[in-house]
Amino acid sequence: MTQRFRRAAGASLVAASIAVSASAASAQSVPFLDTEDATLSGIDVGEGDVHPILSVDVRNGDYARGALDDDAAGLGRVPVHVAIGGAVVLRRDADGRGSVFVVGQSSNGFHAPGAEERVRPRAWYESNTIVGLAWRPVEGVTTAAAYAIKASPNGIAATTHEASLSFLYSAKDAIGALAPRVAVTRRTKGNGGVYTILGIAPQFALGDGESAATLTLPATVGVGWQGFYAAGAGDRVYGSTGLTLAKPVRIGGASASVQAEVLALVRDDGLRRLDAPGGTTDTIVPLATVSVTMAW
């Protein structure tokens, strides 16, 4: 099952995962990696081996893996993210289905700069790039090894590197209907530590035909181990759940999806306190994202 949602990068689930609904021009599905947490999703594309992917989203805040990333949840700065990426089919099975892929994208965040953001370009506060090698040994099973570099063009944060292993099960059975996914990440440059994420994303069609809207109910549990969130932070955990409404459209010859998503982050005491003083220390944080994703 190809998922029809894209997660908001700061919400640690549905961002990262990009997905676009099927359309008359869609000929195959390729895997895709989220820049924030390295989770896998599927995205419908056209024929051929090279597939550009573009997305734009607007959010009420920027949170990464349950913790404040740059912007608190509110309408103070309203960050905008532009992601450019793609997938290349390297190998096909005897039936023509893609089995080995190179995938990647660069997600770039922009907002109204704060007084402390003095390095030009002041508004460009993050640039997260991930590249991976994905393998589909059988239909409905996708694995990937990926490497991400997360930088701050305006110098507000230090550059970090991460290595990840990721898995997605999307076969046409009862378990595949839940679209379970898991990723394990080790930070190779920065604070260090290990991060694990486990999520599901059951999806429901709200009509008949390929142009029908869909409703997805994502749910995730993420754990940062060994001071992943901050030096001395220990092991921290959060959960995320909500809903994503997506409608397939045609834009410039691309298979596209317009999406609206609402998530609730639920953090443990140690994780929520890490947000002070720049963000809320509430246990529950509401996040909303509107996005457009296009794939060729």
Where are these regions (language model features)?
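Short loop/turn motifs that connect adjacent beta-strands in outer-membrane beta-barrel proteins
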Residues: 40-51, 89-101, 121-123, 136-142, ...
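Short glycine/proline- and aromatic-enriched beta-strand/turn motifs that initiate or cap beta-hairpins
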Residues: 24-114
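Residue-level signature of outer-membrane beta-barrel architecture
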Residues: 86-92, 133-135, 149, 167-171, ...
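Transmembrane beta-strand segments that form the barrel wall of outer-membrane beta-barrel proteins
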Residues: 56-62, 100-110, 114-116, 131, ...
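Outer-membrane beta-barrel translocator domains and adjoining extracellular loop/strand segments
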Residues: 64-72, 112-122, 156-162, 192-197, ...
